[in-house]
Regions:
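Solvent-exposed, charged helical/coil patches
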Residues: 1-44, 112-136
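Short beta-strand or tight-loop elements
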Residues: 49, 63, 110
Length: 136
């Protein structure tokens, strides 16, 4: 499990970013600002982390996680009126594809919404593998 203290810090930085920008900006603006806050805090973060999804030894698709903190936490950023189940499903897919167990879904809508997802189960012998490519 990702460190709860770290998770609380990240959520605090999300509120700081939302306070600075309010609502209405593109997702990328909030993503960039949150990355800057995490870097200023000395937190190891990678932006737009490629995730290659493999099946039977072949790459069958790519995802890009907005932010990855260390090897333990994926952060997906949204800037929508309200989160919907499809946003949560996207995050669960990232967890399934990578084998990472913890993720945050942060929405910079009219108010900050945060959903924390845990995935502690990965089927043994699963045919799906993911390669977290090193960032640039």
């Amino acid at each position: 499990m990702a460190d709860d203290t770290l998770t609380h810090k990240i959520i605090g930085y999300a509120y700081k970013v939302h306070k600075a920008f309010g609502t209405g900006f593109l997702e990328k603006i909030y993503e960039n600002a949150l990355r800057i806050e995490l870097e200023k805090a000395g937190i190891c973060v990678r932006q737009q982390q490629p995730i290659k999804v493999c099946y039977d030894g072949q790459v069958i698709g790519d995802y890009f996680a907005d932010l990855c903190v260390g090897e333990d936490l994926i952060i997906e950023i949204k800037a929508v009126q309200a989160l919907v189940k499809e946003h949560e499903a996207q995050l669960v897919n990232y967890l399934t594809a990578t084998g990472v167990n913890n993720a945050l879904l942060i929405n910079f809508g009219p108010s900050v919404q945060v959903k924390r997802k845990f995935r502690e189960y990965r089927p043994k012998g699963s045919l799906m593998n993911a390669i977290l490519s090193p960032g640039p």
